[in-house]
């Protein structure tokens, strides 16, 4: 029965892929039904605390480029700047330092809390959590509980790439397997830590891989309800090994990815982000008419996409984001990390 249902889904999606403009229309209708004409953004700061990493992901242009590691004082300074700017969120991630254990990640949270007790900390990918657990001789659940106790508010659902182990074996062979990623996400939800979800597409993946990935995300959400948004991430092909074989998605493909995600994830996941950093401002505006309802954050700095060739900048003032949304014919609203409206 399960295989029959999957066949029906694939046949329906094949029709959607063959009729993209109808797909765009359907996705936009579903977006309007779920969230209306509101388009959200978050005032946040990105902090990539190190580019040193023991992994060897073929799509990564960030790893070991400068071999830097921010001190806790440097992190505190960035937090102070974020608070002064009015940020409600800090997004904190980094490479995998060889000996990074739970205490290392706790020290980052403590540094943030030394500066500000209230700002929301959105930090540490599932890969970082598994890495901390391995280096500490602890379970993932134990690590997550300690991180939450120290102030972790939510987790980015990064390190997902494509949730298919045959693809992962080629593009990120040392990264956690699909089942491990799913288990970390479910465990986070179980202990009260919401997460985002991501998909990195446009390399050696096919639409079948993408669809299976989205259906897995949908299944997780049906079980836990802990996913706040989906963030589709087009592969950036500059300065990395994978870019020698794959040049990335087209703009049309990016829009179709947004639309298919909206349709497939309906109604479980309400929020789909169009990343202005990766897509560019104009394509992100277009995405607001094919299913997306969020433009992400101000960031203040962003190192990972920039190192892979992104040219859209790494900071956008809230007023610029609002104007971008208005020009696209939507209603801008500032949100927090968990999609509570702050306007």
UniProtKB/Swiss-Prot annotation:
InterPro entries given in the database record: Aldolase_TIM, CofH/MnqC-like_C, CofH_family, Elp3/MiaA/NifB-like_rSAM, F420, FO_synthase_su2, rSAM
Binding site for [4Fe-4S] cluster: 53, 57, 60
UniProtKB keywords: 4Fe-4S, Iron, Iron-sulfur, Metal-binding, S-adenosyl-L-methionine, Transferase
Enzyme class: transferase
Catalytic reactions on record: 5-amino-6-(D-ribitylamino)uracil + L-tyrosine + S-adenosyl-L-methionine = 5-amino-5-(4-hydroxybenzyl)-6-(D-ribitylimino)-5,6-dihydrouracil + 2-iminoacetate + 5'-deoxyadenosine + L-methionine + H(+)
E.C. numbers: 2.5.1.147
Entry-linked PROSITE patterns: RADICAL_SAM
Record carries keyword Iron: yes
Entry-linked Pfam families: CofH_C, Radical_SAM
CDD domains: Radical_SAM
GO MF entry, a single one: iron ion binding
Assembly and binders: Consists of two subunits, CofG and CofH.
Entry's family note: Belongs to the radical SAM superfamily. CofH family.
The protein's name: 5-amino-6-(D-ribitylamino)uracil--L-tyrosine 4-hydroxyphenyl transferase
UniProt source species: Archaeoglobus fulgidus (strain ATCC 49558 / DSM 4304 / JCM 9628 / NBRC 100126 / VC-16)
Upper taxonomic lineage: Archaea, Methanobacteriati, Methanobacteriota, Archaeoglobi, Archaeoglobales
Name of the gene this protein is made from: cofH
């Amino acid at each position: 029965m399960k295989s029959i249902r999957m066949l029906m889904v694939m046949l329906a999606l094949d029709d959607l892929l063959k009729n993209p403009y109808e797909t765009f229309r359907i996705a936009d209708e579903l977006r309007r039904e779920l969230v209306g004409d509101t388009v959200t953004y978050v005032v946040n700061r990105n902090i990539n605390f190190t580019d040193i990493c023991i992994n060897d992901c073929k799509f990564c242009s960030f790893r070991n480029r400068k071999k830097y590691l921010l001190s806790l004082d440097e992190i505190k300074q960035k937090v102070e700047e974020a608070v002064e700017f009015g940020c409600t969120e800090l997004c904190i991630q980094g490479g995998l330092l060889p000996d990074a254990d739970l205490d290392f990640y706790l020290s980052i949270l403590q540094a943030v809390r030394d500066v500000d007790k209230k700002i929301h900390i959105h930090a540490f990918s599932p890969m970082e959590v598994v890495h901390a657990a391995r280096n500490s001789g602890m379970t993932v659940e134990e690590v997550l509980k300690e991180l939450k106790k120290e102030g972790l508010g939510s987790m980015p659902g990064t390190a997902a790439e494509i949730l298919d182990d045959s693809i992962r074996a080629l593009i990120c062979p040392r990264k956690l397997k699909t089942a491990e990623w799913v288990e970390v996400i479910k465990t986070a939800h179980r202990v009260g830590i919401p997460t985002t979800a991501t998909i990195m597409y446009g390399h050696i993946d096919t639409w079948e891989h993408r669809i299976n990935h989205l259906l897995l995300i949908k299944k997780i959400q049906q079980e836990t309800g802990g996913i706040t948004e989906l963030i589709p991430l087009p592969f950036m092909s500059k300065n990395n090994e994978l870019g020698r074989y794959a040049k990335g998605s087209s703009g049309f493909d990016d829009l179709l990815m947004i639309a298919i995600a909206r349709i497939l994830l309906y109604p479980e996941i309400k929020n789909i982000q169009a990343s202005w950093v990766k897509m560019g401002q104009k394509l992100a505006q277009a995405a607001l008419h094919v299913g997306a309802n969020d433009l992400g954050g101000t960031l203040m700095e962003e190192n990972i996409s920039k190192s892979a060739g992104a040219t859209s900048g790494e900071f956008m003032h809230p007023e610029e984001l609002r104007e971008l949304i208005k020009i696209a014919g939507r209603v801008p609203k500032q949100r927090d990390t968990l999609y509570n409206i702050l306007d």
